[in-house]
């Protein structure tokens, strides 16, 4: 139990949130756009065979304050993040190699300095930090050693497509359209984030030009009360951060494949 002062402080903090931030996320509208290639034969857009949502947890931590803020798309895509991290590790290795080489030849380098260079140093020796500031080296070290951990919570949410007929994954008639990666997973009527979509006019593709189609999907999202894991509220500090994303996956028929989008969401403790 919180004492009265803590309750008052918590109430004041909640009062700083905007009306939108205090509202629960219950409905999500998605605007889909399908563009046909200019050199392809005109055809109807592929239909959505199944849909699923996942709650994504992203945790970052560093040994010192981060000098820059990375876009979430870079941190969520492991291959992109590893590429950036590799670049900074290579930069750090080069800096350390240059510093070692400078240290070995520091006396010779100082003998080669011109008079105006000596004057600017006020008769002290040239150090490597004069060429590469310590603050820059520190920033590179932080970025080269930053860690990002992504956890996918598949059963944290229950999602329904508003205005469409939804069928649980456990039903046998739809086993043929479930993506191969999902067929070996256990399913039950409560796990209905996979849905087969009927062809209602309200959610059909609408042609807006000769090569462009648009479609609107409205998702009803609820937290799964049967989900047992502890979800820490979103936060961000100098050394560590925790953020969440709602990942929506759309699987299309006709062998087109799938598409996904990660939508930033905030997890807050609204209880006093």
From Swiss-Prot:
What species is given as this protein's source? Answer: Saccharomyces cerevisiae (strain ATCC 204508 / S288c)
> Which InterPro entries does this entry report, sorted A to Z?
Bul1-like, Bul1_C
Q: Which PANTHER family match?
A: BYPASS OF STOP CODON PROTEIN 5-RELATED
Protein name (Swiss-Prot/TrEMBL): Uncharacterized protein YNR068C
């Amino acid at each position: 139990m919180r004492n009265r002062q803590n309750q008052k402080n918590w109430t004041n903090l909640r009062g700083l949130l905007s009306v939108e931030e205090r509202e629960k996320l219950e409905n999500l509208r998605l605007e889909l756009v399908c563009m046909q290639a200019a050199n392809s034969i005109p055809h109807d857009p592929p239909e959505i065979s199944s849909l699923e949502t996942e709650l994504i947890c992203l945790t970052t931590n560093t040994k010192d304050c981060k000098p820059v803020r990375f876009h979430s798309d870079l941190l969520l895509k492991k291959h992109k993040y590893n590429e950036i991290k590799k670049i900074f590790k290579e930069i750090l290795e080069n800096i350390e190699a240059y510093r070692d080489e400078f240290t070995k030849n520091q006396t010779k380098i100082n003998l080669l300095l011109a008079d105006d260079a000596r004057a600017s140093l006020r008769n002290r020796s040239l150090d490597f930090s004069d060429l590469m500031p310590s603050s820059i080296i520190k920033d590179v070290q932080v970025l080269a050693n930053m860690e990002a951990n992504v956890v996918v919570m598949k059963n944290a949410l229950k999602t329904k497509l508003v205005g469409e007929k939804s069928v649980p994954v456990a039903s046998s008639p739809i086993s043929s359209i479930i993506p191969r990666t999902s067929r070996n997973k256990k399913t039950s009527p409560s796990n209905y984030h996979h849905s087969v979509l009927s062809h209602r006019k309200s959610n059909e593709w609408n042609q807006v030009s000769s090569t462009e189609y648009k479609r609107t999907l409205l998702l009803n999202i609820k937290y799964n009360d049967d989900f047992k894991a502890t979800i820490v509220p979103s936060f961000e500090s100098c050394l560590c951060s925790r953020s969440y994303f709602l990942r929506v996956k759309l699987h299309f028929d006709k062998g087109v494949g799938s598409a996904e989008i990660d939508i930033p969401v905030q997890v807050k403790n609204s209880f006093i």
